[in-house]
Structures are given as structure tokens and as C-alpha cells.
């Protein structure tokens, strides 16, 4: 499941690039808010930063008095192979790796100031930081500003409410897991993190309770009532953490040494020794990673449903956006048609002009389709036990006399149904390749670069045609499979019958053996031979149908419907394609980017699920 966390990381970063980080004011639908995440919540001086650094095993977070975290920090941890060097990357600094983590701390401070200024303001725009290390687990955490009770000098009077509002906007989402940090040397009833968590998650289904500063509690006291859930019950077990002391921080005590000291503390503690295996920052990180993987897997269907609904809404909005009035309709139509022809030429070159597109399509037919058919579970369907059951069910109360024809037919039909999967997968794979070639051809058509609106229209029209071609192709390939089920090749079994009779004359079989396991194995062998023959046929006919319905049609009529529409358009419509006012163009481009994000996310999620 590790690849699912990586997938969500990728989508989160893509969301930020297009301006989707939740709570948008422009009323565009948000994918960010639907993605499972772990938000780290705690009051000032709760040990929140120390917990994060313990999980990472590095000093990298800004420290100081007052409000230090003033923007959400999306911290994506990537486990690497042992022996590789720790490094960090920021989304806003492409192709730059940090190996000095003191510079990471400074860049967080600088990037915060670039948006908020140096006057202690806060911003909901997140900073994305990826850390690659063999000492971490695959995990994504969102570090939020610490909850506070008073404003410091230079901050607006509303800072307390502003921070709580920002934190609440994250943790109130049903897909957000809450990592609530509370110091053990304070009454849990006064914990800012637990107070907010209880308001948004009253049952405690999404909340992880973390107790810090266990080693700083008054002598003779412990936190067992909290850890064991007697004081505050949550769905998940509480985890105790022992952070570095301020003296350790001042001395730059290595985080690996701190981890070892933490383990030793719990292992030797008279209060917590029996809980040592489920205490500490290392255990917390593994627990969060495992849970996040599970939550992502359970949420995939709802995320896909949301993506599909939002795609429909965005496509409707793109169709409805108004455009300015044009002047010379004839010249504009001529220009548009010329750009369309240039796009179609490049698209065809991708298919059969020595470009990689045609080779990728051939690869689907030459490798993917045969491989998928070879992996079909015919062995399970034609196992001795399965054959006996199906033949017996087909015979009913009267066993067959010579050959179980009904049993044969049911076995064959059941086997043939398995071919539908590879057939559908081939159609969808070609569809994705053609859509990608459309995007590439649009990007490579120089004439279109001045007109983002026309680019969007052409992509939408081409994809609409490709969707129709896919529907026809899907019908055709499934019809090929259904045809094999509708009428079996009788001569194949007649030849088998003659061969069987000849073998019987040369080596007579007793009546008892005729209905024993050998008899049913022979049936399975005959059906398997027939299925092999059908497979060889479909490996040849499915590519023919797909090329005829999808590839050939894409070359011949990709923009036919668009041409029919544009030729009947009046000057106003043509002007809308070539010239928009800035506000409408900005809105259209925002919608187009969000639509592209959703479609890419859907394809990537589908691909990840398909691989599984």
C-alpha cells in the first residue's frame, strides 16, 4: 500500500500548484479537502515541533517564542534504501535538494515571510516539504500553527481566532486524521488540542492522542490514566513521547541518540515499562503510516466518485462561460480551421509518423493483451472440483449418458466470460494513449499557444470524440467475446470425440473409470483446449476491432463534430474562441487547470488500482 501514500502525495502537490489547498474563495471545487491527511494540532509549548522532528529524525523546524509556525507545512516523508543520504526538497524550489537541514529551517522561515511578511501574520497557503531518508516511514503530516490564547505585539487582535479557524478548517474535514499533541505535565482537561479535537470529532474516531513531556511530570505521578483511556477514551491508543530537553536542543544532541534515549526511558520506566513496545516516536510514525494507508484504501471509491462529479461540473462551467463578441467572422473561422488542421497533422504524426505513439499502441496488442489473457484464472475455473460441480449441476437428477453437453457449455461459457476483462483493458489503454497524444499535439501546435480558450475547446472536442470511439470499440470487442459464447465451434468437439473413440478401441476403459476423476480431467482438458483456440482467435481479432473503432477513427474524424459546430457558428461564437476578456480567461484557465488536475488524478488512481 506504500504506493497509495506516494500517489496521494503527488496529487496534493499538484493541487497546490493549481491553487487548490482547501477553503478556496473562488468557489471552485476542492480535491485537496477530499484527500486523507494527518493534521498535527497542539498548543504553543506542547512539544509539537519536537514530536515532528523525532518522527523525521532531523532538526529542521523553526524554533522560538510566540507563534513560530505561521503557514501549514505539508511534510511528506519518503523512505529510501539504507545507506542513502538524507535530503529535502521544497515544491516551490524545483530541482533543488537540501542536505543541510539548518538551511531547510531557514528556507521555511524565508518562504513563510515571503507570503506573510515579518509581522507575525498567518496564511493558509501551505509550504510543501519532502524529506527522503532511510530513517523514516512513508507518511504525510500537516503541521499547523500552534493554538494560542493571546496575541503578541505586532499581531492583529484576531490572531487567536484566526489560528483556530485555520486549524479547524483542516481538522473538521471527515478525511483528516487528527494528531492531537498534549503535554503530560498539564491537566488533560485543559489541553487546547484535545478541546478542539473533541469539538470536531466528538466520538474520537479520527483522533490520535499523543502525550509529550512524560519525563517532566511531578515525582510520584504518571499518565497511565490517560494512556490507558480512563481519563479520555479514543478509538486509537494513546502514545507517549519523550522529547529532547531544551538542554539537549541547545547542545545539538543527535536525533538518533535522542531516539535511543527515548527507547531506554520507556524500557526502564517502572510506570511505562510494560507499555514500552507501543510508546515512542518510532512506534507513533509506524502506527500513523499504517493507518493512513488503510484510510486511503478505504476512501478511494469516494474520492473517485467526487472526482467524476467535479469533472462533470467543471466541464459544464467551461461550456457555459461567456465570451466577447468578434468582428470579422469569416477571417476568424479561416484562422480557427487552419489551427485545427495544424493540430490534426501533428496528432497523426504521433500515431504513424515515426513518433512513439504508434509503438505504444502496438505494445498494448503485442504484450499487454496476450499477457493479460495468459494470467486469466482458467486453472481455478477448470479445477477437478469445479468441473465436477458444474457438470453435476448441469446434469441435474439425471446423470449424463455419454458426454455432458450441458456441462461442457457451462464450463466454456464461464471460461469465455474471463476474456471480457483483457478486452476492456485493451480498449481503455488505447483510449488513454490517444488522450495523451491529443494533449501532446495541442502543446506542440505553435499556432494554438496564443489562444488558451481554443486549446480547451479542441481538447474537449477531441476527448468527446475519443469517448465515443471508446464506446464503439468497447461494444465491438465485447461483441467478439459474446459471439464466441453464442455459437461454439462444433467441429472442434467432433474431432475430439472421434479421437476419443479411437483411443477407447485401442485401450478400453471400464465403466467405473469412465465416470471417475479421469473422466472429469478429460472434460477439463477438452475445455481448456477449446479456450486456448478461442484465446488465439481473440488475440488477433481484438486488436483489429480496437484499431478500426478507435485509432483509425481518431485519424479520420477526431474533430468532425467540432467542424460541424464551428461552421454553423456566428461571429460572436468565433470571437469567443479567439478573444476573451481577462476575467473570463482567468476563470476559464482556473477551471481548465482544475479539470486537468481531476482527470490526471483519476487516471493515476485508476492506474494504481489496476496495478494492484
Swiss-Prot record:
SMART domains linked to this entry: DYNc, GED
Presence of keyword Hydrolase: yes
GO CC, alphabetical: cytoplasm; microtubule
Catalytic function, reaction form: GTP + H2O = GDP + phosphate + H(+)
Modified residues (N-acetylmethionine): 1
SUPFAM superfamilies given in the database record: P-loop containing nucleoside triphosphate hydrolases
Region described as G2 motif: 68-70
GO molecular function: GTP binding; GTPase activity
Region named G5 motif: 242-245
Protein name: Phragmoplastin DRP1D
